[in-house]
Amino acid sequence: MNAATPNPHISLEADAATRNTDWAAQGLARFERHFSTGQTPTAEVDGAQRLLFSSSNYLGLAEDPIVIDAAINAARTLGAGSGGSRLTTGTLDAHRQLEAHLAGFFNYPSAVFFATGYQANLSTISAIVGKRGDDFEIFSDQYNHASIIDGARIARARVRVFKHCDYDDLEAQLATRTRPHALVISDGLFSMHGTCADVPRIVELARSYGAWSYIDDAHGVGTLGPTGRGTCELQGAWPDVLVGTASKALGGEGGYACCGPEVATLLRNQARSYVFSTSNSPMVIAAVDAALSRVDAALVSRLQSRARLLRELLRAAGVGVAGLEQSAIIPVHVGDELLAVEAAAALQDRGIQAPAIRYPTVPRGQAILRLTVMATHSDEQVKECARVLAEIFENLGLTRPVE
């Protein structure tokens, strides 16, 4: 066997430095922002007070006193950590109680809770496929979350990507399916676009073509539907598997899959992150359980009214916004990556925290500012955000004629 010709030796640090320089030259370098306060409407970010319009704490439950008290009480009675994975010592009564609460909340027979939302998708998809990759096709929306993309990859099934929310394209691909098992997967509310999947159409097409349906509604739960049960409640259709996260509207961390009892048993035995990850701490589980009880129609309505107000104000100022009207995610179109970074920096200088979203999170040349609202924002804070953003966009030549 011939040995590969070695490259001239450079240190790993030097190699990384070259790649980092190239990444930055494309306007793609990212930096962590340091918070000295919680995820509140006014937060201290990098040592400065700013209006926070970038948090996924949509309902403000991360700071809810009842939620915090639940976490404190759990720590005092059950300790700071779970002590093991779910199949060893890491399943407390609190874990099973939360899973039952989630199943009842969404009206599914069962629910399985994972350490993160990312792990929930990664492991649920691969567990459903199992060792049948050669006999399995996954049909995935082109703008699905990275955790879905990665889950489909490690499942080793054939992955077929359909155009974003184009269900004629999905049906055309389903009609040419060649493998016996199939799974149709989509985000519910798309995190970077603010658009919604057509869940009834997905469920109907999957059933018509002998496939299973799977929706990840991480950003829809707590923000959409009359009572905050998400995209599926809003549209009146429910998939075979509903995945979500506790790290957005519920103000905590962790992920879950709602499903039938046999699928739940499969996940508990074959979902690798469930089997091999230490389970969430008692504090997290208690906080999420309490937060779930705090989701109600009034809180959701308040959030949706804030979202509508910000959209209306931005449109009136000639700022291009996208997404579902009541969605808490408000993508503001920029296009050029470097210009998006400049706009985000100008917002920070004016006391508003809202990030530029660039490749690889969105396609090249489609950079956005991603605004998110919280139910805890006041009307005055929403108006201030709109006013400042409109002024910055006008200065950068990014405003459009008002129709």
Question: What is the predicted function of each stretch?
Answer:
Residues I125-A146:
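Conserved PLP-anchoring active-site segment centered on the Schiff-base-forming lysine
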Residues S85-T89, E99-S123:
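Short loop-beta-helix segment that forms the pyridoxal 5′-phosphate
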Residues S301-R311, R315-R350, Q366, V373-A375:
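Conserved PLP-binding catalytic core of the aspartate aminotransferase-like
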Residues R160-I215:
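Active-site phosphate-binding strand-loop segment of PLP-dependent enzymes
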Residues P65, D69, N73, T77, ...:
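PLP-dependent enzyme catalytic core of the Aspartate aminotransferase-like
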Residues D15-L78, A211:
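N-terminal "arm"/small-domain region of PLP-dependent enzymes with the aminotransferase-like
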Residues E262, S279-D296, R306, A316:
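Structural motif of enzymes handling amino- and sulfur-group chemistry
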Residues E233-L266:
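Active-site PLP attachment segment
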